[in-house]
Amino acid sequence: MIGLGTWVTSVNMMIFKGDITVVIADKDGQYDIDFQLPDKLKDVKIRTYDIVENGNTLKGKGEITMLPGKELEAEVTFNGDKFEGVLRIPFMKRTIELKNGHRISD
């Protein structure tokens, strides 16, 4: 499994601009991804699924409580203790860059 640990990345979205923390763990051989959002977004929940590993890249899908029934897509490429990626919101035809991602703990 790749990318295990606690990561921070910068995002610039309509509802929030700043850093978010992402914890990637191994749960019985499956990726368990937990988003630790700032207090401003404390009621927002994110569910991930269909996570696929390809080399040093993770791709997956998700849903967010603010957009019920709307699927999101993400792709993140790891390079040591850093990563870059994108979050796609297909129904809005929008792509959000995940910038300056870096590991803060294993």
How does the language model describe each region?
Residues 1-78, 86-106:
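Central antiparallel beta-sheet cores of small beta-barrel/beta-sandwich binding domains
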